[in-house]
Amino acid sequence: MLTLARQQQRQNIRWLLCLSVLMLLALLLSLCAGEQWISLGDWFTPRGELFVWQIRLPRTLAVLLVGAALAISGAVMQALFENPLAEPGLLGVSNGAGVGLIAAVLLGQGQLPNWALGLCAIAGALIITLILLRFARRHLSTSRLLLAGVALGIICSALMTWAIYFSTSVDLRQLMYWMMGGFGGVDWRQSWLMLALIPVLLWICCQSRPMNMLALGEISARQLGLPLWFWRNVLVAATGWMVGVSVALAGAIGFIGLVIPHILRLCGLTDHRVLLPGCALAGASALLLADIVARLALAAAELLIGVVTATLGAPVFIWLLLKARR
C-alpha cells in the first residue's frame, strides 16, 4: 500500500514538473512570437524593450493568470456542484460578469473608473453563481443543471445584445466585440486586475482538503465534519471573483474551465492537492498557446482567442457529454 502511494506521489510530482516546464516554454514562446520574432538575445535592445517588455509581457502575464483562474474555477465548480460538466462559460457565469460590466458602462455613461467596472463584472458573476448554487441544492440531474446554466447564459447574452442595440455609445459596441474574448487591449494599465487574481488563485490552491471532501458528495462531506454552508459560500465568492476579474481583463473565454480539469483527471490527477496546482499550470499553458495561435494565424489581423478556445474545446465537450450519458 505504501509502495503504491509513493508511486502515485512520484507520478504526481512528475506531472507537475512537466506542466511547469510546458508553461515556461509557452511563456517564452509568447514573448518571442509575433509579427516580428524577437529572440532571447534581443530582449534588452531598444526594439526588444518596446515589443517584449511594454507590449508582449503584460499581455502574456494576463493570459497566464486568466488561464489559471478559469481552469481552477472549472475544477472548483465541478466539485461544488457535484457535476462533471460545470464550467463558468457553459453555466452562464462569464455572461453574468459581462452583464455587470455592460450595466456599469450604461449607468455610468462611460465615466466610471476601471476599478468600478471590474467590481461590477465580479458582482454579475457572483449573482449568476449564487443562482446556480440554489439550483444545485435542489439535486437537479446533470443535464437539467446544464440546461439551467445554458438558459441563464442565453438570458444574459440577450440582455447584452438588447443593451448594444438600444445604445448609441461607441464604447458599448466595442465592448460587445471585446466580450467575445481577446487580450488585444491589455497593457500595464490593467496590472491591478492581474494583481487582484493572484491572492485568490494562491488561496484556492491551498484548499485541497475541503475540496477533496466536497468531491465525495454532500452527505460524505457532512459526515467528515465539513461546514458545508461556510465552504460553499466562500468558494462561490472566490469563483465569482476569479471569473469576474477574468472577464474584466479579457471578455468571455469558454471551455478552458471544462476541458483542463477533465484532461488532468484522465491523466490520474484526481487528488485536489495535485489537481488544483495542475489546473493552474495547464490552464495557463493552454491559454498561452491559444493566444499565440490567435496572434499568428492571420497575417493582417488577430483572431479572437474565444474563437480559438471554442474551436478546440467544443469537440472535447461533445465527447465528454456523450461519455457522461453512457
UniProtKB/Swiss-Prot annotation:
Membrane topology per the record? Multi-pass membrane protein
Q: Which GO terms describe its molecular function?
A: vitamin transmembrane transporter activity
**InterPro entries for the chain:** ABC_BtuC-like (IPR037294), ABC_transptr_BtuC (IPR023691), ABC_transptr_permease_BtuC (IPR000522)
Q: Which Pfam families match?
A: FecCD
Work out whether the entry's keyword set contains Manganese.
no
Question: What are the alphabetically sorted keywords of the record?
Answer: Cell inner membrane, Cell membrane, Membrane, Transmembrane, Transmembrane helix, Transport
What is stated as this protein's family in its record? Answer: Belongs to the binding-protein-dependent transport system permease family. FecCD subfamily.
Q: How does it assemble?
A: The complex is composed of two ATP-binding proteins (BtuD), two transmembrane proteins (BtuC) and a solute-binding protein (BtuF).
Summary of the function given for this chain in its UniProt record: Part of the ABC transporter complex BtuCDF involved in vitamin B12 import. Involved in the translocation of the substrate across the membrane.
* Protein name according to UniProt: Vitamin B12 import system permease protein BtuC
Q: Which species is the source of this protein?
A: Shigella boydii serotype 4 (strain Sb227)
What is the taxonomic lineage of the source species? Bacteria, Pseudomonadati, Pseudomonadota, Gammaproteobacteria, Enterobacterales
Q: Point out the gene that encodes the protein.
A: btuC
